[in-house]
């Protein structure tokens, strides 16, 4: 008891010394520190104002008291006091007062250190100053010679910073109480997550719009069970926390009627000893656990500076953890639990649900019919059709043990028979042949499909007189091809195994037939188009997907506007069409091929356009620049940069022009006709006579016209082609 009282006196002695220093300035005047006043430290700033009016009386009193014993050393740094102005000292100047009892109060601090210490002592730094002043007073009593002045270079707040870093390192350790807090946060997050799902389907929404929303009943039921499970786990956490706080608590028999206990009966809850020392005192917890701890038995150890004052309470780590956990629980779920509440008061409804019938919380689907022994899902229809008398008879039979046994055996026999029947049906289905060789009514490999395909091919190849009939034939072929894919599904819907096999056969045969038919039709449609629209000007592009009907209508409108030049255009376009039908080239490829060889055509007596092309190709061949480029191209189709620069310098051309010439030349060689030789010969033999006659007739018509009209017709045809 004496040591506890002495501890409290120690904590309050600083304030008492401070009061005596202010009131009895003549007796204990060492609290006035002029050097600290100059540096604006925390002690002088908190106890003494710096202006002359507030500080003059106390300063004069101190100077009068020490007038006889005051001695000044003959140093050139001594500064005299001016009564009218404040005392000012430089950073290293100081004034010594002889005969004072305390030596540790005359400390020299720089302005920077004084300012930083005053900042550190903001808020809770006053207690540290009080403890430091008390320690200085004790040291002054022990020392005999007060005249020596020792300057302390370490500020008061410097070791406190180091201890803070140590405390931070110890807080990071994951102890038992920290793990409890983490688990509690996790459980609360899961509860809020599941509750948000329930709230999303429980709210009515704007004007009841959410009432029509489909509610996932099973999911909502699962969320409710999950919330109950989490609450039970939170209850278990607080139970574990209460058991930890009950370890080493003081028994109730040691307390008197007033709730007080003797200091001799207090022991440490961790080590169990009653030993006390100066720096390792036992501190009682002000929470609900009624335990005491040594300062160094706590983790982290509790220092004297961290002990709260008398009007503030101190909580042990267990009570502190429970307080924080309950605050977190109340803020999250809106409950009102206190630290004094035991774990039985936390979520009693969850425990009641567990005891009252919630043992199957871990099951996803509850079994409501678990106690119903008469339930049989296969006999519902039979029971509904029974008469009242039969129901009474069944009830009377259920009372006897023999009737139960007979019903059980009959039900089991029926189930076995039904299982055997289903097994026989499956065997019959699996025993069916995969290709339906024995089925006389249906044959998936019937020759109708092949006949339809052959008829489609024959229609595409034989019908060359009318284009519309070919389109109609194509539509009928597509319908005929789709029917064998649909019929197997209709005819074999009764047998599952056959339907699967036939659908697989249909899928295997379908894409191959479609791709084969499209390849043939593309060539046949081209031939039909050429035969049907032979005398109409067409485009000479190589794109097979080009919409030829739209192109034909556009060119018909242009041909009507240019009525005078139609014969010339027809003749030149007929020659271009037949020639490019044979070699399958584009306009750009034809222009580049003229550099290598003249364009071949079926008729030698062509129009003016053919004469111009041959003349331009001849000029290009005789051009020395072109010949030089041909020679270099034959040597290397991909020349390097140095070769291109040398050619450009030699032929007086730019490097870009030479590069473009090589690029176009390579493109013209690579874009060779994709038509086979057989198709070319077939087209030659089939149309050579017609083309020659048409070209000859057109040439005769053009020769009869005036020679002046040749140039505008050629330019007009070129403009039309560019469009």
UniProtKB/Swiss-Prot annotation:
Region of interest (Disordered), residue spans: 1-94, 135-173, 357-628, 680-723
Binding region for DNA: 614-673
Compartments it resides in: Nucleus
Stretches with biased composition (Basic and acidic residues): 58-83, 417-427, 518-530, 547-556, 680-690
Tissue-specificity statement: Primarily detected in root tissue.
Compositional bias of kind Polar residues: 11-23, 695-705
Keywords, in A-Z order: DNA-binding, Homeobox, Metal-binding, Nucleus, Transcription, Transcription regulation, Zinc, Zinc-finger
Domain of life: Eukaryota
Pfam families to which the protein is assigned, alphabetical: Homeodomain, PHD
CDD domains per UniProt: homeodomain, PHD_PRHA_like
Compositionally skewed regions (Acidic residues) per UniProt: 365-407, 435-453
Signal peptide: none
Protein name as catalogued: Homeobox protein HAT3.1
Organism, scientific name: Arabidopsis thaliana (Mouse-ear cress)
Record lineage: Eukaryota, Viridiplantae, Streptophyta, Embryophyta, Tracheophyta
Gene expressing this chain: HAT3.1
């Amino acid at each position: 008891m004496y040591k506890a009282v002495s501890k409290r006196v120690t904590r309050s002695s600083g304030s008492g010394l401070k009061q005596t220093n202010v009131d009895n300035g003549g007796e204990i005047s060492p609290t006035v520190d002029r050097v600290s006043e100059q540096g604006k430290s925390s002690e002088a700033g908190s106890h003494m104002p710096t202006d002359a009016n507030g500080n003059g009386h106390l300063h004069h009193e101190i100077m009068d008291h020490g007038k006889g014993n005051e001695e000044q050393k003959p140093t050139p740094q001594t500064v005299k006091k001016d009564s009218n102005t404040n005392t000012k000292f430089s950073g290293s100047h100081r004034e010594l007062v002889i005969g004072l009892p305390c030596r540790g109060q005359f400390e020299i601090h720089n302005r920077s250190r004084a300012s930083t210490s005053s900042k550190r002592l903001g808020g809770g730094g006053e207690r540290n100053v009080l403890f430091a002043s008390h320690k200085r007073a004790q040291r002054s009593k022990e020392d005999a010679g007060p005249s020596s002045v020792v300057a302390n270079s370490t500020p008061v707040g410097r070791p406190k910073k180091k201890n803070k870093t140590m405390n931070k390192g110890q807080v990071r350790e994951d102890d038992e109480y920290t793990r409890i807090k983490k688990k509690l946060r996790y459980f609360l997050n899961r509860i809020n997550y599941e509750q948000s799902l329930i709230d999303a389907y429980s709210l009515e929404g704007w004007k009841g719009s959410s009432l029509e929303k489909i509610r996932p009943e099973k999911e909502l039921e699962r969320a409710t069970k999950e919330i109950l499970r989490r609450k039970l786990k939170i209850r278990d956490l607080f139970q574990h926390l209460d058991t930890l706080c009950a370890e080493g608590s003081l028994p109730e028999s040691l307390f008197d009627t007033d709730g007080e206990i003797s200091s001799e009966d207090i022991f440490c809850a961790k080590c169990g000893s009653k030993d006390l020392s100066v720096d390792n005192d036992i501190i009682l917890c002000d929470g609900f656990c009624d335990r005491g701890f040594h300062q160094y038995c706590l983790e982290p150890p509790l220092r004297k500076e961290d002990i709260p004052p008398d009007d503030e309470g101190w909580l042990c780590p267990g009570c502190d953890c429970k307080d924080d956990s309950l605050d977190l629980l109340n803020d999250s779920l809106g409950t009102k639990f206190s630290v004094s509440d035991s774990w039985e008061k936390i979520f009693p409804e969850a425990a009641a649900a567990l005891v009252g019938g919630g043992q199957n919380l871990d099951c996803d689907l509850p079994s409501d019919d678990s106690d119903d022994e008469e339930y049989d899902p296969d006999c519902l229809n039979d029971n509904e059709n029974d008469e009242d008398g039969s129901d009474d008879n069944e009830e009377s039979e259920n009372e006897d043990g023999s009737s139960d046994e007979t019903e059980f055996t009959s039900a089991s026999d029926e189930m076995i028979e039904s299982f055997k029947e289903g097994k026989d049906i499956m065997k019959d289905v699996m025993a069916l042949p995969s290709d339906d060789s024995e089925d006389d009514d249906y044959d998936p490999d019937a020759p109708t499909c092949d006949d339809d395909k052959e008829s489609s091919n024959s229609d595409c190849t034989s019908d060359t007189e009318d284009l519309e009939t070919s389109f109609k034939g194509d539509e009928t072929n597509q319908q005929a091809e789709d029917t064998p894919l649909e019929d197997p599904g209709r005819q074999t819907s009764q047998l599952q195994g056959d339907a699967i096999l036939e659908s697989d056969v249909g899928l295997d045969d379908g894409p191959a037939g479609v791709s084969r038919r499209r390849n043939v039709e593309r060539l046949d449609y081209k031939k039909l188009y050429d035969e049907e629209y032979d005398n109409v000007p067409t485009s000479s592009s190589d794109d097979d997907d080009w919409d030829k009907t739209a192109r034909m209508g556009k060119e018909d409108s242009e041909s009507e506007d240019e009525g005078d030049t139609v014969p010339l255009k027809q003749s030149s376009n007929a020659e271009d069409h037949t020639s490019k039908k044979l070699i399958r080239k584009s306009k750009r490829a034809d222009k580049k091929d003229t550099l290598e060889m003249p364009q071949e055509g079926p008729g030698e007596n062509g129009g003016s356009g053919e004469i111009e092309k041959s003349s331009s190709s001849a000029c290009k061949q005789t051009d020395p620049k072109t010949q030089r480029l041909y020679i270099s191209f034959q040597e290397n189709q991909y020349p390097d940069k140095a070769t291109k620069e040398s050619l450009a310098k030699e032929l007086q051309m730019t490097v870009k022009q030479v590069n473009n010439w090589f690029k176009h030349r390579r493109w013209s060689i690579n874009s060779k006709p994709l038509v086979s030789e057989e198709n070319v010969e077939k087209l030659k033999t089939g149309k050579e006579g017609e083309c020659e006659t048409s070209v000859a007739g057109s040439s005769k018509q053009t020769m009869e016209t005036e020679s002046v009209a040749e140039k505008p017709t050629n330019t007009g045809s070129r403009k039309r082609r560019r469009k």
